[in-house]
Amino acid sequence: MPSMRVTTDTWPRRAAQEPLLLLLLRSSLMKSASLQALNPNRAMAAMGRSVRVVLDSSVLLDPSGVTAEEEEVVVALRPGAEALLRRLRYSNLRVAICHPEGLPTNESGFLEKTAKLYSFGYMPLTSPSGSNLLNELMLEWSGTNFCFYVTSGVHEGLLSELQNHNWEVIAMGNEDVIKNSGVIHISMLQELLITLATSIKKEIGNSSAFVVGYVMKQSREEDFAKRGAFPIYPSKNDLIFVPLSFELPLASQLQEVDLVLHKITDEIINIDPNSSISFPKGISFSPGMSEIIRFVEEHCDFCVIDPFKNIYPLLDRIQIQEILIRLEGLSAEGRPKLRAPCFLKIESFCGSELQKQLAEAKLSFPLIVKPQVACGVADAHNMALIFKIEEFSNLSVPLPAILQEYIDHGSKIFKFYAIGDKIFHAIKNSMPNASHLKSSSGGKPLTFNSLKTLPVATKEQLLQNEVQDSKLLDINLVEEAAKLLKELLGLTIFGFDVVVQESSGDHVIVDLNYLPSFKEVPDNVAMPAFWDAIKQSYESRKQMTQT
C-alpha cells in the first residue's frame, strides 16, 4: 500500500487538473443516467442533502500491478475494492470514480468499465473552458451536498480548495505525512464505509439517527442490499447501515455503531447434534462472531437485534415443535384448529425399534424426515419423504432426526412474516399431495434439500387442487398466532410457514425461522417496515436497560 504524500512539486499534471474536480463531477453526474436512477428526491428526504462520494483512482487500482510474460501490466482493483464498490452501489450515496488526465489507456478504460458495472459516475480530469466559474460551482456543491473526496495521495492545492468549500477529504495511507490538515485518515480501504457512516451521522447532528452495524453472509447481504435494505445514506427513519468487517478490529467498530443486526446462524462453523437441546453449548462460531458475542456479554447495555439467547431455540427442530405446541390454545369453537405437525424424535433408523416408536406416537406414513439441527450447518436442510418402513434403510438424513406427518395441503403454502408490529403473508406453490409423490417415487424414499430441490407441484396437479386461497386460510387466526409467537420468541423479525390440511382444515405451522428474506413482500412496503422494526426494537431495548 503506497504512502500518502503532500507535495507541491510532484505529479505536476495531476496538480494542475485536480482542482477542476467539482466542475467535472457536476457535468458527469448530470449526464449519468445510472445515477439519475437513484432518485435524488428519495435521497433528500432523510436529511435534506445528498451525499456525494468521489473515489480517486489511487484508492481503487492495485498499485503493485501484475506483470505478465509480455511485460504488460495487468490492471486490477486493490484488495478490498470489489467489496467496497459492491456495497456502495446500493448505499443510496452518489458515487463517482475519477482519475487524472494522462492515465494509461488500459487503466482509464478499466476504470470506465468499472464505473459502468457498478452504475457510478465516471470522469477523466481534462481541461474545461470557463474555469473562472470553478469557485462558484464549488460553493454551490458544498451548499447543497455533503461531499467526500477519497484518495491515497493529497495535493496541497487541491486539499486547500476542497476544505475551503466544506468537502471532507478521506486519505488512505500514512497519517504522519499530513498533520493538522483536517484530513480524515484511514489505514485500509475496509475502513472507508464505517468512516462514511460515522461522518454522515455527525453531519446530521440528529439524536434520532443511529448507525446499524450488520453481520451476515455475503449472499444474504447482497440480496437485502439490492432491495435497498442497507443504505449508508440515512433511511427515512434515520438509520445508517454499515457492514462490520472481520478484517478490522471489531472492538473499535462496535464502539462506533449504536446496535448490531445479525444473522448469527450464518457464522456457525459446526454444531454438535448431541448438544442441540442445550444450545449454545456445542456450537462453534467463526472467530469474528465469537468476538462479537464476547463483546455483547461484557457490555450488557449494548443492543443486538436480536438477543442471541432468543435465537438459539430456532436451531433445534424439537424446540421449535415445543414452541408451536403452545399456540394450540388459540383454537376455539367455530374456528379452524391451529397446531404443530405430529412428530417423533429418533436416534436411529433401526426398523424394529422404529416400528414400535411410530405406533406409540400414532404416526402413519407418509412421513417427512428432517435433521434435528434446523440451520447453520450444510446438511440441516437435507430431508426425505418416506412411504414405508423399509425405506429407512440406508437413509442419508443426519441423526438425530425428527419424523413429521406429511400433510396433504393442496400444494399451497402460506408464508408469514412478522416484521416488528407488522405482519405480511404470501402464497406460494408447494409440494404435491402424497399420492402424486408416491406414484413418482419409484418405490424409493424421495430425498431433497428444502432450500434447493424441494419438489413442487406441476401445473396439472395445481389445477386438480384448485381452491380459492382466501377460503382456505383464516388470516385472523394466523395473525393472532404471529403476535403470540412474537411474545414467546422475543424476536423482532421472524417468519413461519402454514399449510391447511385438506381433510380437516387444520392450520399447521410447519416451519419457523429468524430474519427471513421476506422476498415475497414488495420492497416499497417491506423496507420501511424493516427499518421501523429495527428502530423500534432498539429504542425499546434501550429503555429497558435504562430502567
From Swiss-Prot:
Highly expressed in embryos and at lower levels in roots, leaves, flowers and anthers. Monomer. Keywords: ATP-binding, Kinase, Magnesium, Metal-binding, Nucleotide-binding, Transferase. This is Inositol-tetrakisphosphate 1-kinase 6. One of its GO terms (biological process) is inositol trisphosphate metabolic process. Residues 327-539 form the ATP-grasp domain. Binds 2 magnesium ions per subunit. Its cofactor is Mg(2+). It catalyses: 1D-myo-inositol 3,4,5,6-tetrakisphosphate + ATP = 1D-myo-inositol 1,3,4,5,6-pentakisphosphate + ADP + H(+); 1D-myo-inositol 1,3,4-trisphosphate + ATP = 1D-myo-inositol 1,3,4,5-tetrakisphosphate + ADP + H(+); 1D-myo-inositol 1,3,4-trisphosphate + ATP = 1D-myo-inositol 1,3,4,6-tetrakisphosphate + ADP + H(+). Its EC number is 2.7.1.134, 2.7.1.159. Kinase that can phosphorylate various inositol polyphosphate such as Ins(3,4,5,6)P4 or Ins(1,3,4)P3 and participates in phytic acid biosynthesis in developing seeds. Phytic acid is the primary storage form of phosphorus in cereal grains and other plant seeds. It comes from Oryza sativa subsp. japonica. InterPro entries: Inositol_tetrakis-P_1-kinase, InsP(3)kin_ATP-grasp. Mg(2+) 1 binds at D497, D511. ATP binds at residues 317, 370, 404-415, 430, 450. Mg(2+) 2 binds at D511, N513. SUPFAM superfamilies: Glutathione synthetase ATP-binding domain-like. Belongs to the ITPK1 family. It comes from the Eukaryota. GO terms for molecular function: ATP binding; inositol-1,3,4-trisphosphate 5-kinase activity; inositol-1,3,4-trisphosphate 6-kinase activity; inositol-3,4,5,6-tetrakisphosphate 1-kinase activity; magnesium ion binding. 1D-myo-inositol 1,3,4-trisphosphate binds at K263, H381, K415, N513, S517.
